[in-house]
């Protein structure tokens, strides 16, 4: 009887890095969840399809509270791919795995409360918010997109600047480690300086944005002065302030 021998093909395992958002909950959890709801309300679909890591490093809670938090996030459509900094006793079957070795980048924070703007204040418009510190990155490469970014599409380029020759539709997103240049209307979301670049800027021919962010400082449509909507503008950071001015 003949025996046919076949060579077993090995399973290929590869290491690969991916960009994920890190959420850092604070006590009391219900108050933090309310602020998260506010961010989601201000920018619809912000967490849709986005991988998220839960940072437990400075959060002293019990397992029952963690189960409650994970369920609350799941109910809000926030998918937790892993948990960082949690005690081993907190995690178990059916829960996200422990994550280690994450490399820091610009932090993601919900917009902070701010005072009402003075109608008589001179331009450029300044709005105060809290910004997490990052490490400046220089001499970045660039990416050029020669067509519009349609609703539901995302452009990720954490290595440097992104230029869009066209518009960014509502529900679309552009994420860049450096600056973002949009030669059209910005209706979706633009997140610049995500590699910790405090000198990053956002430029667009027409501002109708759902959300803009530079180095972790976020502003939603409700936070932006109405007089800048529909205008050609640039946005940048000056310390802990996001500044906006029209382009001549």
From Swiss-Prot:
It comes from the Bacteria. GO terms for biological process: cell morphogenesis; division septum assembly; regulation of cell septum assembly. The keyword Transmembrane helix does not apply. Keywords: Cell cycle, Cell division, Septation. Residues 94-125 are annotated as: Disordered. The keyword Membrane does not apply. Belongs to the MinC family. HAMAP family: MinC. Interacts with MinD and FtsZ. Cell division inhibitor that blocks the formation of polar Z ring septums. Rapidly oscillates between the poles of the cell to destabilize FtsZ filaments that have formed before they mature into polar Z rings. Prevents FtsZ polymerization. PANTHER family: SEPTUM SITE-DETERMINING PROTEIN MINC. This is Probable septum site-determining protein MinC. The gene is minC.
């Amino acid at each position: 009887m003949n025996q046919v021998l076949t060579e077993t093909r090995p399973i290929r395992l590869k290491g690969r890095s991916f960009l994920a958002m890190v959420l850092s909950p604070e006590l009391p959890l219900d108050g933090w969840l309310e602020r998260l709801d506010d961010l989601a309300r201000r920018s619809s679909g912000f967490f849709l399809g986005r991988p998220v890591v839960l940072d437990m490093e400075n959060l002293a809670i019990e397992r029952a509270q963690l189960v409650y938090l994970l369920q609350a996030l799941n109910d809000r459509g926030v998918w937790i791919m892993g948990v960082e900094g949690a005690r081993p006793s907190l995690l178990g079957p059916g829960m996200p795995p422990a994550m280690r070795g994450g490399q820091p980048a610009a932090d993601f924070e919900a917009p902070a409360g701010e005072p009402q703007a003075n109608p008589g204040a001179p331009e450029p418009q300044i709005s105060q918010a809290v910004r997490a510190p990052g490490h400046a990155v220089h001499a970045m490469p660039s990416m050029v997109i020669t067509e519009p970014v349609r609703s539901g599409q995302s452009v990720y380029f954490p290595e440097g600047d992104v230029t869009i020759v066209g518009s960014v539709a509502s529900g679309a997103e552009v994420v860049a480690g450096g600056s973002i240049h949009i030669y059209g209307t910005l209706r979706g979301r633009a997140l610049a300086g995500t590699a910790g670049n405090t000198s990053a800027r956002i430029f667009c021919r027409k501002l109708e944005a759902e959300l803009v962010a530079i180095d972790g400082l976020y502003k939603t449509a409700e936070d932006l002065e109405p007089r800048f909507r529909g205008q050609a503008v640039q946005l940048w950071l000056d310390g802990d302030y996001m500044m906006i001015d029209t382009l001549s």
